[in-house]
Swiss-Prot record:
Residues at which Na(+) binds: 265
Bilayer-crossing regions: 245-260, 263-279, 302-320, 469-487
Organism: Rattus norvegicus
Protein's job: Component of neuronal acetylcholine receptors (nAChRs) that function as pentameric, ligand-gated cation channels with high calcium permeability among other activities. nAChRs are excitatory neurotrasnmitter receptors formed by a collection of nAChR subunits known to mediate synaptic transmission in the nervous system and the neuromuscular junction. Each nAchR subunit confers differential attributes to channel properties, including activation, deactivation and desensitization kinetics, pH sensitivity, cation permeability, and binding to allosteric modulators.
GO biological process, one term: nervous system development
The encoding gene: Chrna3
Protein name: Neuronal acetylcholine receptor subunit alpha-3
Tissue: Expressed in neurons. Expressed in umbrella cells of urothelium (at protein level).
Reaction catalyzed: Ca(2+)(in) = Ca(2+)(out); K(+)(in) = K(+)(out); Na(+)(in) = Na(+)(out)
SUPFAM superfamilies in alphabetical order: Neurotransmitter-gated ion-channel transmembrane pore, Nicotinic receptor ligand binding domain-like
Length: 499
C-alpha cells in the first residue's frame, strides 16, 4: 500500500491546526499569570480579614539521613518541607482560561510563611525559595522545597556503639505568632515513604508534636512543630573492627598465665597486648564525641582491658621473681609450704609428680652390710699383708679379696648419701692411708651431691609455687574477663528494657 502525499498547502494547514490548542493554552496561562500578579504583593499576608490567621498545613518528609557527627553533635538530614495554605488573591475561574486548573509559579513571586529550623547548627535557617509552587484555581498553594539541614543534637554516647539517640527538629515561623499563622500538622509522624536507608543508623520512629510557647522576649504565643527522631546505631561495623579484636586480645592476656615461666616470653606477650590496646584506644577517640560528661561503653571496655593487661604484667613479674628463687637468696616460710604446696594444689586439682624414695631403706641396709663385711675383712686370719709382710705381686688371697670389696664399696658409695656408712669406713684402722683418703674424697662428693639435691628440691618447690600462682590467676582472669565483658555489654540491653 503506497504512501499518500498531501499537497504542500494542505500540509501547512494541518500543522497550524495542530499547534493552535498548544498556542491557545500557552496564551491562556500567560493571561492568567498577568491577571494573578498584576496587583499582587508577596509581602502582605493573604487574608481577607487582618485578624484572621493563615492556616498552614505542614509536613516533613525524610529523604536521607546523611550523617550524625558525634564529635560536633550535629545531625545532617535531607528533607522535603511540605507546606499548604490558601491565598484568596490567587483564585481564578478555569472556564475563563480554557480550563486551566493548576499553574506553577516561582516561589519568590508569592507570599510564603517564614518557616525555619530553630535548632539549626550550620548553614541557612530558611529553605531556598528557588523552587516553584503549585497553584490551584481554588487559591490553594502547595510548596514542597527540598533542603539539607544540619541540626544540633545532644548525643549520649554512654552505650556506644549500642546506643540509641533522640534528635529533635523544631520548625516554626520566625516572625509570625499564633494570631498570624496557625500551623497544622499533617499526620502524626514524619513521612518516611521516600526514605533512603542509612548504612550506620536505623530510624525507629519519628513522631511529630505541635507546641505553643510564650518566649521571654515577646508577649505573643508562638507555635512550632517538633519532630523527635529516634535512631539506633547499627553496631556491625564496630563489632567486627573493635569489639571482637578486643575480646581476642583479652583472651591473649589470659593465656599469659598459661605460658611456662621458663619460656621467657611472658612479659613480652603482656607488653605486646598492652601496645595493641593502646592503638585501639587511639582509633576510637576519633569516632566518639570529645566530652567529659560520660565515658562510652567501648571506652570503658578498653580501659577495663588495659587495667587487666597492666595487672597481668605486674603479676607476671612477681611470678617470675618467685620462679627463679634459690635457697641462697630466699628461705621458704612454713605458711608458703602449707598453702601453696599442700592446700591450694588440692583446691585447684593440681597433682605434682613425686620422686621415688622407696629404695632408700634397702640401699642403706645394703651399704651397712658392705661396711660390716669390710670390717670383718679387716680382722681376717691372713697375716701375710696384714701383719706387715706384704706379698710381692699382690696376688695373695687377702689382697685380691680386699681389692674386690673396696671396688664394690666405692661403686656403691657414690650412689649413697649416708654419712654413717662413710664414717664407719673411716673408722677402719686396718686400711692404708691411700684408701682412707679415697674414702674421704668419696664422702665429700656424696655430701656435695646431697646438698645439690636438697637445693634442687627447694628450687623445684619455688617453681611449683610460681606455677600454683599462675594457675590461680589464670582462673581469676578467665572469670573476670567473662563477667566483665558480659556485665559491660549487657548494660544497653538492660537499659532498653527499663525504658
Amino acid at each position: 500500500m503506497g504512501v499518500v502525499l498531501l499537497p504542500p498547502p494542505l500540509s501547512m494547514l494541518m500543522l497550524v491546526l495542530m499547534l493552535l490548542p498548544a498556542a491557545s493554552a500557552s496564551e491562556a496561562e500567560h493571561r492568567l499569570f498577568q491577571y494573578l500578579f498584576e496587583d499582587y504583593n508577596e509581602i502582605i499576608r493573604p487574608v481577607a480579614n487582618v485578624s484572621h490567621p493563615v492556616i498552614i498545613q505542614f509536613e516533613v518528609s525524610m529523604s536521607q539521613l546523611v550523617k550524625v557527627d558525634e564529635v560536633n553533635q550535629i545531625m545532617e538530614t535531607n528533607l522535603w518541607l511540605k507546606q499548604i495554605w490558601n491565598d484568596y488573591k490567587l483564585k481564578w475561574k478555569p472556564s475563563d482560561y480554557q480550563g486551566v486548573e493548576f499553574m506553577r509559579v516561582p516561589a519568590e513571586k508569592i507570599w510564603k510563611p517564614d518557616i525555619v529550623l530553630y535548632n539549626n547548627a550550620d548553614g541557612d535557617f530558611q529553605v531556598d525559595d528557588k523552587t516553584k509552587a503549585l497553584l490551584k484555581y481554588t487559591g490553594e498553594v502547595t510548596w514542597i522545597p527540598p533542603a539539607i539541614f544540619k541540626s544540633s543534637c545532644k548525643i549520649d554516647v554512654t552505650y556506644f556503639p549500642f546506643d540509641y539517640q533522640n534528635c529533635t527538629m523544631k520548625f516554626g515561623s520566625w516572625s509570625y505568632d499564633k494570631a498570624k499563622i496557625d500551623l497544622v500538622l499533617i499526620g502524626s509522624s514524619m513521612n518516611l515513604k521516600d526514605y533512603w536507608e542509612s548504612g550506620e543508623w536505623a530510624i525507629i520512629k519519628a513522631p511529630g508534636y505541635k507546641h505553643e510557647i510564650k518566649y521571654n522576649c515577646c508577649e505573643e504565643i508562638y507555635q512550632d512543630i517538633t519532630y523527635s527522631l529516634y535512631i539506633r546505631r547499627l553496631p556491625l561495623f564496630y563489632t567486627i573492627n573493635l569489639i571482637i579484636p578486643c575480646l581476642l586480645i583479652s583472651f591473649l592476656t589470659v593465656l599469659v598465665f598459661y605460658l611456662p615461666s621458663d619460656c621467657g616470653e611472658k612479659v613480652t606477650l603482656c607488653i605486646s597486648v598492652l601496645l595493641s590496646l593502646t592503638v585501639f584506644l587511639l582509633v576510637i577517640t576519633e569516632t566518639i564525641p570529645s566530652t567529659s560528661l560520660v565515658i562510652p561503653l567501648i571506652g570503658e571496655y578498653l580501659l577495663f582491658t588495659m587495667i587487666f593487661v597492666t595487672l597481668s604484667i605486674v603479676i607476671t613479674v612477681f611470678v617470675l621473681n618467685v620462679h627463679y628463687r634459690t635457697p641462697t637468696t630466699h628461705t621458704m616460710p612454713t605458711w608458703v609450704k602449707a598453702v601453696f604446696l599442700n592446700l591450694l594444689p588440692r583446691v585447684m586439682f593440681m597433682t605434682r609428680p613425686t620422686s621415688g624414695e622407696g629404695d632408700t631403706p634397702k640401699t642403706r641396709t645394703f651399704y651397712g652390710a658392705e661396711l660390716s663385711n669390710l670390717n670383718c675383712f679387716s680382722r681376717a686370719d691372713s697375716k701375710s699383708c696384714k701383719e706387715g709382710y706384704p706379698c710381692q705381686d699382690g696376688t695373695c688371697g687377702y689382697c685380691h679379696h680386699r681389692r674386690v670389696k673396696i671396688s664394690n664399696f666405692s661403686a656403691n658409695l657414690t650412689r649413697s648419701s649416708s654419712s654413717e656408712s662413710v664414717n664407719a669406713v673411716l673408722s677402719l684402722s686396718a686400711l692404708s692411708p691411700e684408701i682412707k683418703e679415697a674414702i674421704q674424697s668419696v664422702k665429700y662428693i656424696a655430701e656435695n651431691m646431697k646438698a645439690q639435691n636438697v637445693a634442687k628440691e627447694i628450687q623445684d618447690d619455688w617453681k611449683y609455687v610460681a606455677m600454683v600462682i599462675d594457675r590461680i590467676f589464670l582462673w581469676v582472669f578467665i572469670l573476670v574477663c567473662i563477667l566483665g565483658t558480659a556485665g559491660l555489654f549487657l548494660q544497653p540491653l538492660m537499659a532498653r528494657d527499663d525504658t
